[in-house]
Amino acid sequence: MKVITYSSMKDFIDDTLELLLKDEAVNQLLIFTALSKKDLATNDTLHVGKVIDENNEVSLIFLNSQPYNLLAYTPNETINVDAVKLLAEYLVNNNIRIYGINACKTISETFIRYYKKLTKANFTERLAMDIMELSEVNDIILPEGNFRQATLEDLPLLSRWFCQFSLDATSELIDISIASSFMKEKIS
């Protein structure tokens, strides 16, 4: 079993995209992140790769784009614990910092268990999520009411919503004054 890394996002995409697309609903964040950085070379804050087994079969695909969470995916029905352990060891041995992990529950728990042993780091679950695939769309009748553009009167509410959404979506705390400035610019 070994970790294979890529020096460019293009090489990573060329080698893994077909496999990631087979389970696109689960891999949307990983695919989007990779494609949005497709012209970049990997560096101190961007690491991508895969773990392959002794038969050269992919056991795990990963992308770590700091300051965001490590993204990990397995194309297999069962989790290869050794692959997850090897990824944790690789990250620690290469001093690659992670801010959290986004993966299925089994991968996340296995990774955290090994990573904690190696680093004494603590993890707190911030947001557990289920991934649901939209397979059918129904027409709906919009409720009665008036929609309007936001005004500066709405700024406190919109700023709080922005901060909460950021925390929910990215586990990132945003200062309310920064959110307020951003929302004020959008309203104007």
Predicted regions: what they are:
Residues 1-30, 137-173:
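Short amphipathic alpha-helix that is part of the acyltransferase structural core
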Residues 26-45, 170-188:
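Active-site rim helix/loop that mediates acceptor-substrate recognition in acyltransferases
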Residues 4-5, 24, 32-94:
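Conserved donor-binding loop and adjoining core beta-sheet/short helix segment
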Residues 115, 119, 162-169, 187:
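Short, well-ordered alpha-helical segments in soluble proteins
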Residues 65-144:
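Acyl-donor-binding surface of acyltransferase catalytic domains
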Residues 7-36, 40, 100-115:
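An N-terminal domain-start capping segment
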Residues 19, 37, 90, 114, ...:
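Residues that form generic nucleotide/phosphate-binding pockets
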